[in-house]
Amino acid sequence: MRRSWGVNALVALAAIASTWTAAANDVSQYDLRVTLDPTEQTIVGSERVDYVNDSGRAIDEILFLLYGNAGAEPNPDLHPAHLDAQYVHGFDPTWTRIRGVTDADGRAMEYDIESSSPTLQTYSLEDWFLVVALPEPLAPDERVTVTVEFETRFASAITLDNCVYRGTYVWRFGWNPVAVPPSIRDGGFLLPAAAYGATLTVPEEYRVFAGADRQTKLDTVAGLTTYELTNEHPVRSIPLVIGRDLEAVTASWEGIDLEAAYLPSGEAFARLALSYLAEILAYHSERFGTLGYRRLIVVEAPAPGFYGMAADGMILVGRSLVQLKDMPALGMYDRLAEYLLAHEAAHLWWGIGIGTDFDAENWISEGFAEYLSITYFEEKHGGSEPNLFTHLGPGLVEDLIGIELGYLNLRQHLSESPYLDLLRLGFDEPIVRPTAELEYLNGQTVRTYSKGYLVLRALESLVGRDALRDALVRANEEWRGRILDVESFRALTEEVAGVDLAAFFNDWLYGAETFDVAVDRFETVAADDGYETTVHLRRTGAVLPVEVRATLADGSTVSRLWHAGTSAGSIVLDSTSPVVRVHADPDEMLPDANRFDNHWPRQILVNHPFRSEDAPDIGRPLDAYVISISPTGISGGFRNDHQWSLVAMPHLGGDAFAADIADAFGAIDVVVAFAANIDRSLSVSATAMATALDVANGTGDLDAQFTLHTRRFSNPETGSAGTYWYPTQWLDLTFGVRGELPQAAPYVELAVGRSDAIPLYLENAFAVRAAIPGFGSGSFATIEWSGFKRFRLAPHLYFDLSAFAGAPLFGRTTTEFQYWMDRLEAFALPPYGDHQLFGRVDLVLPPLVRNLGYPILNLTRIEDVVASAFVQGGRTWGSCTLVCESGIRVEAGAMLTFVVDGVLGGNLAISLGYAVPLLGLDGESSVFLEVSLPR
């Protein structure tokens, strides 16, 4: 069958002897003639490459990247169960195989296959490069023609790219051998632009959506359809999406053909995407230069998730964003989708249109795409107030979403807040750095996207918005279709703006500088014609000019620029009205590590039920301490640094129907919580729950604890060339009090643990707990251990083993500190005691369904359904004061676990189970329900 497809693929070739309409003459040209074979999950065929030597020196070989071989082997550093999440039936390889290389006359050429050095990843390094030996040296700017016969395989996977999932094939870059500079051997990831054209043959039941200026359906012969794909300008690839279930809607903008391809039930999003896309293209084109494509398609990707990906002439959108568009509220993710489309469309200018080294200098791609998209979003939806979910209408669900997520601001909480967390965790380092040299791989995404955007925003503040936009337009004119490096962009911007940017680039791109400006105080004195105010300022970190804005008593403002050349200084403001407050960097243009001290006086905002309906939303700004008051309690916090809350409600444990209200609500329940993140290795938390608290009599049940959490990181191998930091060991020190007031017993607990989840799927924890004598209980101490291990029997088939053991070290434990087997489902009253042994084994079967997407009342969707069976049991004994039968109890059961969609990509696991007692007194078969996070 494969041979017959290859024959039919040639039927239309006579009509397309020349597929180039306006391709540049100084770039290489690719003429691809390929066929999709769904049986083998491969694209097979040939490429005729008219190669131009643009290296500036004579060469005797051509280097081709075989990108498909990056996925030829599984990652040996990850436990196989982690890999299962990416694949349909366990690991499935991608690869590109070379069948032969010939010259322009059809004569065989010598070639070799080379491995890669571990510059991007540390596994699957074999066969990365095809090296074609030239019969004689090729002079600079000269051409040579070679034809490569190849076959590339799609993985059966949910890896977003280079895969086939549910009959839809997706591959953006490098499905064909790509000629690359020889320097790539030493690192970097470059995709030179070339004049690409192709004929693609597929079974007639498949539809093709390719990123090409023109896609023409030629004819169908013997059940096979051939498409012609051409481009008017050099591109970096012809991205492909091929599937049986895809449909499309079309539109146009300024003569550019727009398409949106969607899977079943995705039409509403497709039409919305076309509407957004027209607005986005108009904005980007007007401000950042001409779009270099004649056709653009948006495609719903088959893999779930809230993500977007771009390639030449194509934007892919994760299926979850499409399918959850109106769930659980109408238009729930419309703003998020608009931003994502703006980001991916920006790549048609930066990253794809203007190329870069996607390894060391990916800032030019992702940082610039963030700058274009967030600038667009803020000009349309505002930049300082909540703006991601404020478009939702009234309603019960909508109001709940507003309470939980209504504060979100795109820039503040999706860019600045992650950057601040990066600083707190100590994962910052230069933006421009190859993967293999990264000291903190954990921070790579935040540095490239979030910090990268903030650096461009600061650059705009430094040179001016008009100058930066002029530089971006000029870069689009001069570098589209080429590879732009950071130094060339710096030189271009300096020329346009007339500003020396060496220090700025050294601080923020080649270095890991930070910045913080603070208003220490101000003094106002009366002058002859008004008032004179001296503002005292302080700066740490990089030198950046700062706007200082003062608000006057009459509501007007005055501003002045502080150049911040010294670490401390002052400026003088003249005004006709007294100054009441001062704000440094009021438009939040600079990557400030602490915006709270940008105000004088400091901002403390109070949200309460009696605020005017016309008052602006307070949200959760990064420059203010926010306190919220509700009928049941009070809460507050600052950024992600710390949060606290206090909630008090009447205790309903008594007779709620009593005639005397005092009898019904004679006590209260109080919950207090506090959490603070200090740095990568240290955090603190405190919780206190007082149940049936009678303040007058000093009675009630109390469970309170204050914990110091410490983490020790290691650098396990992850398959990436960079250094990854994982919290392998932890130590928690807890001071608490537990029991009935006034005799509640204070205690201290030391817990240590180790996680080897990445390579072994193994976790262990030990804890020692000791009561503090003299407060109503005797002295005692306990020790306990718990562990978990997952064994992979086959793809998606697991054997989970968990165990617990606890015993006293000395003394007699009180009831509040005794053990009981609370995981048992078939025993209503398992015994208490100061000794316990407990174990559980689970057999987790492959999912009955996966990524089902079954809606439930338009509130959520069932994604996965997993069946499992378990046996668990143990014994608790010694010093019992409550339920005291100390025999062994064992039960068996089965569960169906439904994984449902949460909010913003989070999931919940709801398990419905049935347990049967096997051994022990008082057992009774029972149905149970559990809610947890998916493992």
What is the role of each PLM region?
Residues 730-737, 743-873, 877-880, 884-885, ...:
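C-terminal outer-membrane beta-barrel translocator/porin domains of Gram-negative envelope proteins
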Residues 85-100, 114, 123-124, 128-135, ...:
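Extended, low-hydrophobicity, Ser/Thr/Pro/Gly-biased non-transmembrane segments
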